[in-house]
Regions:
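Short cysteine-rich clusters marking metal-coordination/redox-active sites
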Residues: 8-11, 28-31, 71
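A short beta-strand-turn-helix
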Residues: 14, 40-59
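Cys/His-rich microdomains that often coordinate metals
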Residues: 15, 35, 75
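Short linker/helix segments within small regulatory modules
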Residues: 17-26
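Thiol-based oxidoreductase modules, predominantly thioredoxin-like and allied folds used
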Residues: 42-43, 63, 78-82, 86-101
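Structural micro-motif
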Residues: 55-59, 106-115
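Conserved redox-active cysteine motifs that mediate thiol-disulfide chemistry
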Residues: 63-77
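Non-catalytic, surface beta->alpha helical segment in thiol-disulfide oxidoreductase systems
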Residues: 110, 115-146
Length: 146
């Protein structure tokens, strides 16, 4: 079972949460505060495939690098996207500086790269810096593709 780590907004501890439980209103293991998925969540190469396959909602996988100015500029836009689509989209981030092999595995050649998955399959992708409007179009086009 693949899990992602959701930080508690109240007590700040990390809560490993199975991807299948994201829609069942998970709660913090310590304080029982509701855990919301309304920000991009950092992930690892070990968790990516399992989460993409088992998540009950579409997954936007964001490849970024700390040294990349376009990645830094995209961060606030991706936060807005995650907040706007909370409960309907899971936004995951993978740091390619710490996980360089994932770029090759997913055919990523520019930062940031966004790949939309639904039902475990890739639907659409964008590479390089893009506006909020272009990211929303990616989500809309990806929702329409079957």
């Amino acid at each position: 079972m693949s899990s992602i780590v959701l930080p508690c907004p109240s007590c700040r501890i990390d809560n490993p949460t199975p991807a299948q439980q994201l829609l069942s209103r998970p709660r913090c293991q310590r304080c029982q505060q509701a855990l919301t998925v309304n920000t991009p969540i950092e992930t690892t190469r070990e968790a990516i495939d399992g989460v993409i396959r088992s998540a009950p909602l579409p997954v936007l996988l964001v490849f970024y690098s700390q040294w990349s100015a376009p990645s830094t500029m995209a961060a606030p836009v991706l936060l807005q996207v995650a907040q706007r689509h909370a409960g309907r989209l899971l936004v995951l981030r993978i740091n390619t500086d710490m996980n360089p092999d994932v770029m090759k595995r997913y055919g990523v050649t520019a930062m940031p790269a966004l790949i939309l998955f639904r039902g475990g399959s890739e639907r659409k992708r964008l590479q390089g810096a893009h506006s909020a409007v272009e990211i929303e179009q990616l989500l809309s086009d990806g929702a329409a593709s079957r």
